[in-house]
Design a protein with these regions (language model features):
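Nucleotide/phosphate-binding catalytic cleft detector across ATP-hydrolyzing
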Residues: 1-105, 113-167
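Conserved Rossmann-like nucleotide-cofactor binding loop
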Residues: 108
Length: 167
């Protein structure tokens, strides 16, 4: 089995207007590379998934449309709970977790899932990814105490909003 991996960081530089031109260019370049790889290795079915950056970007639908027109790939944009579900399925195939939580920390978002009897019970996607928090709250390197406090408050605020999450 061949494996290709590329870190794109679509969220980097995202503003209220959406994904930046440079981020979209990185995305297009990577998707073209993956498409060429799939075509050259005889892959019949491609199931491309877009997650938090595209889901949350004001111009996410434009990005999806351009990918379809320019590259010939139909991106599926996952909702946050669905993303948490797929993270859980992947985790349960790797670890013997019976009850507990699965947490996937990405650049843009964090998916957290409740697992009972080795089954997905509930999930949520939070805008608590490392890049999202840094771009929102941190201007200094290293971060100031005030910036760290703001990040901690945002994490607590978003976690408190999940009704099924234990205290």
């Amino acid at each position: 089995v061949d494996q290709v991996r590329e870190v794109v960081r679509l969220r980097k530089g995202m503003t209220d207007e959406g994904l930046s031109e440079s981020a979209m260019a990185r995305g297009f370049s990577t998707l073209r590379l993956f498409k060429r790889f799939c075509d050259s290795t005889g892959v019949d079915v491609i199931l491309p998934i877009a997650t938090s950056a595209v889901r949350e970007a004001a111009n996410g639908p434009l990005f999806v449309d351009r990918v379809a027109r320019e590259i010939g790939i139909s991106l599926r944009v996952l909702g946050g709970e669905r993303e948490a579900y797929y993270d859980t399925v992947g985790a349960l195939n790797e670890v013997p977790l019976v009850e507990g939580s699965v947490v996937d920390i990405g650049g843009g978002s964090v998916q957290i899932s409740d697992v009972r009897d080795r089954s997905f019970r509930a999930g949520a996607s939070l805008t608590l990814g490392a890049l999202a928090l840094t771009e929102e709250f941190v201007e200094h390197d290293p971060a100031t105490e005030d910036e760290i406090n703001q990040v901690e408050e945002e994490i607590a605020r978003q976690l408190d909003a999940i009704a099924w999450l234990p205290e």
